[in-house]
């Protein structure tokens, strides 16, 4: 499967004598890439050299271009991916934010009434983060015992498998959920906001966790609300 982008059009070709054309617009591009990955797998999705030509013109936020950057990364073009991100930042396109905390990926969860606690990519702003890490490690063991297997394909860094599994476990939405669990009564609904699309591995992890903890866990990413309950998600595993 190939995914190619020209100056003003996006083209998606499948192994059938049909092609899908759509206007070159960020949200539709994201939907096409997401569905293509779901059908064929990341390794079968490739980008053309023209993907990055409209970065500055078409994207108001750096994270709108993550699907294109990731296409380069999945295709082995890590240097191209890094250059794409750098180009966006140099041209004053700002990273997305959640509340007042700016980080590569931000989350907020409310505990103790209306007091917001923030966690982000650097994990510096979360209160009692050491306790949250301990709890997350414990939750990881429970989820593994329940059948969870890390999907390391979602880690785009060129590191070994063990490091990839550790990187997945430290995704900040998991830390935010662990923080919520230790600071709320059993059975309480946990709500987390995330400014990036949740990865497939975290999605699977939270599904299993919702069943183990017997809680509803609501995650709002940049696409939709995910209501996790009893091992299932409201999105039906397609988002």
Curated annotation (Swiss-Prot):
InterPro entries the record matches: DYW_dom (IPR032867)
GO MF terms held by the record: zinc ion binding
Region annotation (Disordered) ranges: 40-59, 101-122
Transit peptide extent on chain: 1-35
Keyword Metal-binding: yes
Keywords per UniProt: Chloroplast, Metal-binding, mRNA processing, Plastid, Transit peptide, Zinc
Residue ranges of the region described as Type E(+) motif: 113-144
Protein's GO biological process: chloroplast mRNA modification; chloroplast RNA modification; mRNA processing
Observed effect of gene inactivation: No visible phenotype under normal growth conditions, but the mutant plants lack editing of the ndhD-1 site.
Region (Type DYW motif): 145-239
TM regions (residue ranges): none
Cofactor binding remark: Binds 2 zinc ions per subunit.
Bias-annotated ranges (Basic and acidic residues): 111-122
Cofactor(s) recorded in Swiss-Prot or TrEMBL: Zn(2+)
GO cellular component: chloroplast; plastid
Location(s) in or outside the cell: Plastid, Chloroplast
Function text: Plays a major role in single RNA editing events in chloroplasts. Acts as a site-recognition transacting factor involved in the edition of the site 1 of ndhD (ndhD-1 site corresponding to cytidine-2), which is a plastid-encoded subunit of the NADH-plastoquinone oxidoreductase. The interaction with CRR4 is required for its function in editing the ndhD-1 site.
Family to which this protein belongs: Belongs to the PPR family. PCMP-H subfamily.
Binding partners and assembly: Interacts with CRR4.
Miscellaneous information on this protein: Unlike other RNA editing factors, DYW1 does not contain identifiable PPR repeats but does contain E(+) and DYW motifs. Therefore its association with CCR4, which lacks E(+) and DYW motifs, but does contain PPR repeats, is required for its function in RNA editing.
Name of the featured protein: Pentatricopeptide repeat-containing protein DWY1, chloroplastic
Organism the protein comes from: Arabidopsis thaliana (Mouse-ear cress)
Higher taxonomy: Eukaryota, Viridiplantae, Streptophyta, Embryophyta, Tracheophyta
């Amino acid at each position: 499967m190939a995914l190619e982008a020209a100056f003003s059009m996006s083209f998606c070709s499948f192994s059938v004598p049909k092609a899908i054309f759509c206007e070159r617009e960020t949200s539709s591009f994201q939907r096409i890439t997401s569905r293509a990955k779901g059908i064929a797998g990341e390794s079968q999705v490739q980008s053309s050299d023209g993907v990055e030509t409209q970065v500055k013109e078409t994207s108001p936020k750096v994270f709108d271009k993550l699907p294109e950057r990731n296409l380069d990364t999945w295709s082995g073009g890590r240097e191209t991916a890094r250059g794409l991100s750098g180009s966006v930042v140099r041209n004053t396109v700002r990273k997305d934010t959640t509340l007042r905390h700016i980080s590569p990926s931000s989350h907020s969860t409310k505990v103790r009434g209306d007091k917001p606690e923030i966690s982000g990519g650097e994990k510096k702003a979360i209160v009692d983060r050491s306790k949250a890490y301990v709890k997350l490690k414990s939750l990881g063991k429970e989820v593994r015992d329940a059948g969870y297997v890390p999907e390391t394909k979602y880690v785009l860094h060129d590191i070994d498998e063990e490091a990839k599994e550790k990187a997945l476990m430290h995704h900040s939405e998991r830390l935010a959920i662990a923080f919520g669990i230790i600071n709320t009564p059993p059975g309480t609904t946990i709500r987390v906001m995330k400014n990036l699309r949740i990865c497939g591995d975290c999605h699977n992890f939270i599904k299993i966790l919702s069943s183990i903890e017997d809680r509803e866990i609501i995650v709002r990413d940049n696409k939709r609300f995910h209501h996790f309950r009893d091992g299932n998600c409201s999105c039906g595993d397609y988002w």
